[in-house]
Amino acid sequence: MPQQLSPINIETKKAISDARLKTLDIHYNESKPTTIQNTGKLVRINFKGGYISGGFLPNEYVLSTIHIYWGKEDDYGSNHLIDVYKYSGEINLVHWNKKKYSSYEEAKKHDDGIIIIAIFLQVSDHKNVYFQKIVNQLDSIRSANMSAPFDSVFYLDNLLPSTLDYFTYLGTTINHSADAAWIIFPTPINIHSDQLSKFRTLLSSSNHEGKPHYITENYRNPYKLNDDTQVYYSGEIIRAATTSPVRENYFMKWLSDLREACFSYYQKYIEGNKTFAIIAIVFVFILTAILFLMSQRYSREKQN
């Protein structure tokens, strides 16, 4: 079977809760950002120091870079989805197996060489003072292929979510250049809309007319799961707040199944028949809203 391409939509009802997946040991206290770069496609920050271990990892994986993704609007900018729920953005923390391999380039040639942590960004009413330290650096890399020293004290630990339960699966790097094991924290960190909009002011590589344009979005659409791809979860299986069908209600279960069928149709035809794909994803949005409203009503009825 071919390797599972990343990113994916994680269906929580199909994920396997595995008690053997212990809490990760995250050692970012000694990690320091060295440079920040506008690649023309994304924001990349290079790090020195810091590593992760524990969990299911055979040994220590050192932090190399972080990549930041966003969308045109605040409601969709993440690569990965949880039950078709889209987050405002996503940070990918790329690590490599330094104990076993001599370099990142060597590590990415092997299926146990790369680990990527995904942290979701969710727009809220309040600014994130820690994320702001990254935002403050963006003026120094406004044009494509610009790089600058990261000249602010920055502690990556402060960008970790409040809950560190995680999903994990075997996939690829976002650009599909290497195999990678993914660790995805479903609990997002909150940022302000103004902070995210600053990323949309960055310039990308020139288009066919030779004129630079803005990186208004850079997220990737999810890929269909291979038949043999399995997603595991380190805690009790959760459901995203906007996709919590009440299983006692058969009508809601039917709506949930219909929504998933529409999303599968969207994934299948997005590269071909875009019209039908757009219709399918519109139905996904509508059904998600209906399910959310019905689940809220059901919750109130239970409380009463």
Curated annotation (Swiss-Prot):
SUPFAM superfamilies: Carbonic anhydrase. The keyword Disulfide bond applies. The keyword Disulfide bond applies. Its main location: virion. Keywords: Disulfide bond, Membrane, Virion. SMART domains: Carb_anhydrase. It comes from the Viruses. Induction: Expressed in the late phase of the viral replicative cycle. Pfam families: Carb_anhydrase. It is found in: Virion membrane. GO terms for molecular function: carbonate dehydratase activity; zinc ion binding. GO terms for cellular component: membrane; virion membrane. Apparently non-glycosylated. Belongs to the alpha-carbonic anhydrase family. Binds to chondroitin sulfate on the cell surface to provide virion attachment to target cell. Homodimer; disulfide-linked. PANTHER family: CARBONIC ANHYDRASE, CARBONIC ANHYDRASE 7. This is Cell surface-binding protein OPG105. The lineage of its organism: Viruses, Varidnaviria, Bamfordvirae, Nucleocytoviricota, Pokkesviricetes.
